[in-house]
Amino acid sequence: MSNLLLGVNIDHIATLRNARNTTYPDPIYAAFIAEQSGADSITIHLREDRRHITDRDVEMLCKTIQTSMNLEIAATDEMINIACTLKPHCCCLVPERRQELTTEGGLDIINKANKLQDIIFKLTEAGIRVSLFIDPNEQQISVAYNIGAPYIELHTGMYSHATDATTQNLEYKRIKKSVQYAVNKGLKVNAGHGLNYYNVRPIAMLPGIQELNIGHAIISRSIFCGLPKAIQDMKKLIQDSRRG
């Protein structure tokens, strides 16, 4: 069974910094610690309102990350131009609404297929690996495949935030079925959103998933045990789960 990678989202390091408009804690230093602690990639989301990660953060991280940088962006001209200029290793296209606390669902790529196909081509031409953040839905996956997306990231929010075991099990089955469907089409599959130390194990056990992107849970735990241990604990958990 293939090794499962861990992408660490450091957005909330920047959230804490910006809460008091200080220069600390520094996301660039957090990325360094994360890499030293076993993170396989670093994920950041440059939102249109710059509520946490800033343009300077992205520029500095592009220069300093030694593993892989996954830049989450909305499918807007401004963001695509930033990505093509800075050339992160990977761009994950995500939906974005200004009033949301965090990304609330997957891209509706069915109704935006032509636009997204052009963006995928432009980013790929710039040497950037492209991923689409989508809900676990076979129709969305089919369109992702048809417009040339090499990677998808399945939105695990409905599973993660389920309030009862029955609902969570139904959402898990949707994710499992979607992973199998995507892999059979030749897509590479990542997953993330809302995953934590208590719900990640079943998702980590799915053999078709290559990487899990996790942020809030890791940063929250790091308050009590430190960032290195929080990352090491999560990496051990997902890799032990993958091995069974």
From Swiss-Prot:
<feature type="site" description="Transition state stabilizer">
    <location>
        <position position="153"/>
    </location>
</feature>
<dbReference type="InterPro" id="IPR013785">
    <property type="entry name" value="Aldolase_TIM"/>
</dbReference>
<feature type="binding site">
    <location>
        <position position="52"/>
    </location>
    <ligand>
        <name>1-deoxy-D-xylulose 5-phosphate</name>
    </ligand>
</feature>
<dbReference type="InterPro" id="IPR004569">
    <property type="entry name" value="PyrdxlP_synth_PdxJ"/>
</dbReference>
<protein>
    <recommendedName>
        <fullName>Pyridoxine 5'-phosphate synthase</fullName>
        <ecNumber>2.6.99.2</ecNumber>
    </recommendedName>
</protein>
<dbReference type="InterPro" id="IPR036130">
    <property type="entry name" value="Pyridoxine-5'_phos_synth"/>
</dbReference>
<feature type="binding site">
    <location>
        <begin position="11"/>
        <end position="12"/>
    </location>
    <ligand>
        <name>1-deoxy-D-xylulose 5-phosphate</name>
    </ligand>
</feature>
<feature type="active site" description="Proton acceptor">
    <location>
        <position position="45"/>
    </location>
</feature>
<feature type="binding site">
    <location>
        <position position="194"/>
    </location>
    <ligand>
        <name>3-amino-2-oxopropyl phosphate</name>
    </ligand>
</feature>
<feature type="binding site">
    <location>
        <position position="20"/>
    </location>
    <ligand>
        <name>3-amino-2-oxopropyl phosphate</name>
    </ligand>
</feature>
<feature type="binding site">
    <location>
        <position position="9"/>
    </location>
    <ligand>
        <name>3-amino-2-oxopropyl phosphate</name>
    </ligand>
</feature>
<comment type="subunit">
    <text>Homooctamer; tetramer of dimers.</text>
</comment>
<feature type="binding site">
    <location>
        <position position="47"/>
    </location>
    <ligand>
        <name>1-deoxy-D-xylulose 5-phosphate</name>
    </ligand>
</feature>
<dbReference type="GO" id="GO:0005829">
    <property type="term" value="C:cytosol"/>
</dbReference>
<comment type="pathway">
    <text>Cofactor biosynthesis; pyridoxine 5'-phosphate biosynthesis; pyridoxine 5'-phosphate from D-erythrose 4-phosphate: step 5/5.</text>
</comment>
<keyword id="KW-0664">Pyridoxine biosynthesis</keyword>
<comment type="function">
    <text>Catalyzes the complicated ring closure reaction between the two acyclic compounds 1-deoxy-D-xylulose-5-phosphate (DXP) and 3-amino-2-oxopropyl phosphate (1-amino-acetone-3-phosphate or AAP) to form pyridoxine 5'-phosphate (PNP) and inorganic phosphate.</text>
</comment>
<feature type="binding site">
    <location>
        <begin position="215"/>
        <end position="216"/>
    </location>
    <ligand>
        <name>3-amino-2-oxopropyl phosphate</name>
    </ligand>
</feature>
<dbReference type="Pfam" id="PF03740">
    <property type="entry name" value="PdxJ"/>
</dbReference>
<keyword id="KW-0808">Transferase</keyword>
<dbReference type="GO" id="GO:0008615">
    <property type="term" value="P:pyridoxine biosynthetic process"/>
</dbReference>
<dbReference type="GO" id="GO:0033856">
    <property type="term" value="F:pyridoxine 5'-phosphate synthase activity"/>
</dbReference>
<feature type="active site" description="Proton acceptor">
    <location>
        <position position="72"/>
    </location>
</feature>
<keyword id="KW-0963">Cytoplasm</keyword>
<comment type="similarity">
    <text>Belongs to the PNP synthase family.</text>
</comment>
<feature type="active site" description="Proton donor">
    <location>
        <position position="193"/>
    </location>
</feature>
<feature type="binding site">
    <location>
        <position position="102"/>
    </location>
    <ligand>
        <name>1-deoxy-D-xylulose 5-phosphate</name>
    </ligand>
</feature>
